């Protein structure tokens, strides 16, 4: 039997977007492997993965996990969050990065105000999608998703059966498969 992580990777590599149903403590340890699968080495220039988090603290903890896990392949992982200096964060992104981790609102603001290039994006991850929707991030996520090139999308949620959630996800994640922790 395949593990939750292996099942998600298999579907993503086949070009299908994935809705992962699990708690953060179940998927956070797997995020570095998802990133490494699509951003295997450092390159100059544009981001190749975006990770959208609900809160500043979530973004900081995911950033820390990714920094440790990708140290050996020397990926540049930039952290952008609401309480940080927008000017410093913008300058960091202009210097080039492989992965951007941050709050949904700040990533969206920086993207639309400063236009970092998403042309090479390979992986778009939204964490705690159900909570992000209930906290008013729906519009930010939709605007980012509409701007993306064809890339793999990975959405994590705990409550996938809510009708408003299902309808919203189908707007921009297609085709998709659902993978649940057993």
Give the positions of each predicted feature.
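Conserved pre-motif I regulatory segment
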Residues: 1-26
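Motif I (Walker A/P-loop) of helicase-class P-loop NTPases
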Residues: 4, 27-38, 139
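Conserved SF1/SF2 helicase motif Ia
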Residues: 17-21, 31-62, 74-75, 148-152
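Conserved beta-strand segments of the P-loop GTPase G domain that flank and frequently precede/overlap
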Residues: 21, 51-54, 80-81, 101, ...
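Conserved nucleic-acid-binding Ia/Ib motif block in the N-terminal RecA-like helicase ATPase lobe
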Residues: 44-102, 106, 121
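Post-DEXD/H (motif II) to motif III coupling segment of the RecA-like Helicase ATP-binding lobe
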Residues: 118-182
């Amino acid at each position: 039997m395949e593990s939750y992580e292996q099942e998600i990777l298999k579907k993503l590599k086949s070009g299908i977007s994935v809705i992962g149903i699990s708690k953060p403590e179940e998927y956070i340890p797997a995020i570095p492997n998802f990133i490494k699968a699509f951003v295997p080495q450092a390159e100059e220039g544009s981001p190749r993965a975006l990770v959208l988090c609900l809160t500043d603290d979530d973004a900081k903890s995911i950033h820390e996990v990714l920094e440790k896990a990708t140290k050996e392949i020397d990926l540049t992982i930039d952290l952008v969050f609401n309480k940080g200096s927008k000017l410093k964060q913008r300058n960091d992104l202009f210097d080039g990065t492989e992965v951007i981790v941050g709050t949904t609102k700040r990533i969206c603001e920086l993207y639309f105000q400063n236009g970092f290039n998403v042309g090479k994006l390979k992986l778009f991850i939204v964490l705690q999608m159900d909570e992000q929707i209930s906290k008013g991030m729906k519009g930010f996520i939709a605007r980012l998703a509409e701007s993306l090139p064809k890339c793999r999308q990975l959405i994590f949620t705990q409550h996938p059966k809510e009708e408003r959630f299902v309808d919203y996800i189908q707007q921009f994640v297609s085709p998709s498969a659902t993978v649940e922790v057993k």
